[in-house]
Curated annotation (Swiss-Prot):
Coiled coil residues, start to end: none
CDD domains: DEADc_DDX54 (cd17959), SF2_C_DEAD (cd18787)
Highest taxon in the source lineage: Eukaryota
Domain Helicase ATP-binding residues, every copy: 126-298
Protein name as catalogued: ATP-dependent RNA helicase DDX54
Length: 874
């Protein structure tokens, strides 16, 4: 019976299972393992199952909340971009980039760059720009302003577009800043697929024509070359949606008004405008020409303009000994491994100092605006790759240039404007690092130093004449104005004079640099009259050694220096009338009587001078404004901007009782008193572009009323005024440029005829590019067959242009993609998504598990090796 018993239909045992059943079981196991390791895309079925369970619990009468579907009855389509941004935002409170609702490619570029937490200016500006508002933003140097306008630009453009024309435009004042912006654009937008074109002066225009023919999404340019290319190509910027003015105040003040007007005239009406700089005035009437529409003002770090990690030192030296002091600083004060940037006034100073320092063994390079573009790139690359330790530049590199691992800045020529000082010293102490700024101040530059401290709201600290090194270190070296020991100047100057006597080239460069210094002194803006008056009151002859040098000398050397200073400052108490005169001499008696009469006046004068020397040289006292005046200032700012972010909050004083007593003792009626200048007058005057409130001539020029004549002769009379030229010894035109030819652009403005030289037409003929392929010829229905340019031609003449003659007029390159191109593009996009979410790792892990299961199963035979078809499947 046992032998004849039939087996039931239950599951067979493992050794006797058929191969086709094993294959089905393996598929089920593989599907289960994939379900465990799948990402969020494969979890839709689990979510649907949970929703079904919740629906069964709620009952048939209640519906679950869900996103609006495409079958909605509303006439307005749902804004999917806002929904995606809301979905991307973190539900919990977070201060990182996750809470801004950025798309995945943009967020991945941020993480790849290494940014974790946004800076204060990024946290304030990025959400406002994402809302589509015009923004005017100001924050101190090194605070991450470049990412503030790049990240919203990537989020707005999303991905590569098939439409013709650029959609974003970034304008920079200098080529180096544009190159740096291009570098950050490539790094942050690595995963967006956006194409960028760089339009810079000094590069070949043919390469820029080719770059614009590739239909870029973003154009990064300097204004002069962009206008040149736009006029040559008859370029239309009607598709631009997003415009950035980087270092906006520098763009509007360095003579780009004509170019900027032409660029703004080519832009469409509904574009978004963003202005960024480290120094921006509060009332941006000067930037009205940028086309701002209900802008939002964001000003951070208005009070603390300098970084806390930045240390400043001011050295009082003569103009002819600055080179010697610079050499001493580079060889003895600055560490050998540190990198230093030296700012000079003109390109002649840069060439002279480069040759001089190279002869003394200091490795250096120089950059100025007139230098060839290739040489500028080479010298900057040498400095950034630590091939040389010193870079001598003009104010070209003061704006926005981010040089990594920069430790020191030396102002060889002291800046004439406070905001220029901010941009210069802002090259160091960036992104949390520390740095030092040394400034060489000549006696005629002391008023500019006082103007700078008025602008910063700080006090000038003078070095004490006879101060011990321990006391000087305790007081601190930050912001101290002091002398340089004469022994240091003599030692370094002797070596420089020896080197100059042995080189005729150095002598010629030195002579040219001196002439350039005289031209610079005549052309630089004048300081304020208050600072000139206060500079005359300072007793610079009694100025002590700077703590930077007093700590480097021994006590014996310091005593010798003090003795030399006391001999130099010695003044006898007797006059010429009392020398070799007896007590009964009339001249001696007269001087004694005069000294007795003026004794009190002399004593009071000496006492006031002693008090001035003991106390710090404070800037002009900041007057406390009443509450009504502060409210009036806030209303003035809010009248210009729709929203103001980062206003200065009222901080309570240290002693409210003392302030109340001072208010009671004032002899002015606060209800009717109107101040003649606002509280932040000095700060805003330093930030101003046109220098309003500065020189008297500028104020007078603004108050002049120009009346137009009522006849053609009277209208042109003002343009024909002559002016005497001292060099030419004759009368010349007021501007001296009347003989230059002008051309009229599409926007109606007249620009120089040098912008139109038919370079683009020559390039198209050289590259064999047909005019009908370009976007300027009109829509596609006008590109049909028709007569060619030039009339009838023979067959032999047509062979000189092979492309134009070989392509028939009716067969043009179609912009519609074929089925194969669409499938190929979809496969590439699917492959990119597969790789971005880690599909390659999942696939390799799945293959390893499959191979392991096959080795364990082995079809019940236990053989370790596989042959034939099974081996191919593995």
């Amino acid at each position: 019976m046992a032998a004849g018993r039939r087996v039931g239909p239950g599951p067979p045992s493992r050794p006797t299972m058929a191969p086709w059943k094993k294959k089905r079981l393996r598929k089920r196991r593989t599907g289960a393992s994939q379900g465990r390791d799948s990402d969020s895309d494969d979890g839709e079925f689990e979510i649907q199952a949970e929703d079904d369970a919740r629906a069964r619990k709620l009952g048939p009468g209640r519906a679950l909340p869900s996103f609006p579907t495409s079958e909605c009855v509303s006439d307005v389509e749902p804004d999917t971009r806002e929904m995606v941004r809301a979905q991307n935002k973190k539900k919990k409170k977070s201060g990182g980039f996750q809470s801004m609702g950025l798309s995945y490619p943009v967020f991945k570029g941020i993480m790849k760059k290494g940014y974790k937490v946004p800076t204060p200016i990024q946290r304030k500006t990025i959400p406002v720009i994402l809302d589509g508002k015009d923004v005017v933003a100001m924050a101190r140097t090194g605070s991450g302003k470049t990412a503030c306008f790049l990240l919203p630009m990537f989020e707005r453009l999303k991905a590569r577009s098939a439409q013709t024309g650029a959609r974003a435009l970034i304008l920079s004042p200098t080529r180096e800043l544009a190159l740096q912006t291009m570098k950050f654009t490539k790094e942050l937008g690595k995963f967006t697929g956006l194409k960028t074109a760089l339009i810079l002066g000094g590069d070949k225009m043919e390469d820029q024509f080719a770059a614009l023919h590739e239909n870029p999404d973003i154009i990064i340019a300097t204004p002069g070359r962009l206008v040149h290319v736009a006029v040559e190509m008859n370029l239309k910027l009607q598709s631009v949606e997003y415009v950035v003015f980087d270092e906006a105040d520098r763009l509007f003040e360095m003579g780009f008004a004509e170019q900027l007007q032409e660029i703004i005239g080519r832009l469409p009406g509904g574009h978004q405008t963003v202005l960024f700089s480290a120094t921006l005035p509060k009332l941006l009437v000067e930037f009205a020409r940028a086309g701002l529409t209900e802008p939002v003002l964001i000003r951070l770090d208005v009070d603390s303009k300098l970084n806390e990690q930045l240390k400043t030192s001011f050295l009082l030296v003569r103009e002819d000994t600055k080179a010697a002091v610079l050499l001493y600083l580079l060889q003895n004060v600055v560490r050998p491994q540190d990198q230093t940037v030296v700012f000079v006034a003109t390109k002649h100073h840069a060439e002279y100092l480069t040759e001089l320092l190279m002869g003394q063994g200091v490795s250096c390079a120089h950059i100025y605006s007139a230098l060839d573009q290739t040489a500028r790139k080479i010298n900057l690359a040498k400095f950034t790759h630590n091939k040389c330790s010193t870079l001598i530049v003009t104010d070209l590199a003061a704006r926005g240039l981010d040089i990594p691992l920069l430790d020191n800045v030396i102002n060889y020529s002291f800046p004439a404007k406070g905001k220029l000082f901010l941009h210069r010293v802002g090259r160091v102490a960036r992104a949390g690092r520390s740095g030092t700024a040394y400034s060489l101040v000549a006696p005629d530059e002391v008023p500019y130093l006082l103007d700078l401290h008025l602008f910063l709201g700080r006090s000038v600290t003078l070095a004490r004449p006879c101060e011990e090194p321990s006391v000087a270190d305790a007081v601190g070296r930050d912001g101290v104005l002091g002398r340089v020991p004469q022994s240091v100047v003599d030692d370094e100057d002797s070596s420089l004079q020896t080197a100059m006597g042995a080189s005729l080239d150095l002598q010629g460069l030195h002579r040219v640099a001196n002439n350039a210094q005289q031209q610079y002194v005549r052309s630089r803006p004048a300081p304020s009259p208050e600072s000139i008056k206060r500079a005359k009151e300072l007793d610079l002859a009694e100025l002590g050694l700077h703590p930077l040098f007093s700590s480097c000398f021994e006590e014996g050397e310091l005593q010798r220096l003090r003795l030399v200073d006391s001999i130099k400052n010695y003044r006898t108490r007797t006059t010429i009338f009392e020398i070799n005169a007896s007590s009964k001499d009339p001249s001696s008696q007269m001087m004694r009587a005069k000294r007795q009469r003026d004794r009190k006046a002399v004593a009071s004068f000496q006492q006031r001078r002693q008090e001035r020397q003991e106390g710090p040289a404070d800037p002009a006292p900041q007057r406390e404004l009443p509450q009504e005046e502060e409210e009036e200032m806030v209303e003035t700012v809010e009248g210009v901007f729709t929203e103001v972010v980062g206003q200065k909050r009222p901080r309570p004083g240290p002693s409210q009782g003392a302030k109340r007593r001072r208010m009671e003792t004032r002899q002015r009626d606060q209800e009717f008193y109107v101040p003649y200048r606002p509280k932040d007058f000095d700060s805003e005057r330093g930030l101003s572009v046109s220098g309003a409130g500065g020189a008297f001539e500028q104020q007078v020029a603004g108050a002049v009323l120009d009346l137009m004549g009522d006849e053609a002769q009277n209208m042109s009379r003002g343009q024909q005024q002559l002016k005497w030229d001292r060099k030419k010894k004759r009368f010349v035109g007021q501007s001296g440029q009347e003989d230059k030819k002008k051309i009229k652009t599409e926007s109606g403005r007249f620009i120089s005829s040098s912008y139109k030289r038919d370079l683009y037409q020559k390039w198209k003929q050289k590259q064999k590019i047909d005019d009908r392929d370009s976007e300027e010829e009109g829509p596609s229905n006008q590109r049909g067959p028709g007569p060619r340019r030039g009339g009838k031609r023979g067959r032999s003449q047509g062979t000189s242009q092979p492309r134009a003659s070989s392509v028939p007029a009716g067969r043009m390159r179609s912009e519609l993609k074929t089925k194969e191109q669409i499938l190929k593009q979809r496969r590439q996009a699917q492959k990119q998504r597969f790789l971005q979410r880690g599909g390659l790792k999942q696939l390799s892990a799945r293959n390893r598990r499959r191979a392991q299961e096959l080795r364990q199963g082995a079809f019940g035979r236990g053989a370790p090796s596989r042959k034939g078809k099974m081996r191919k499947r593995m």
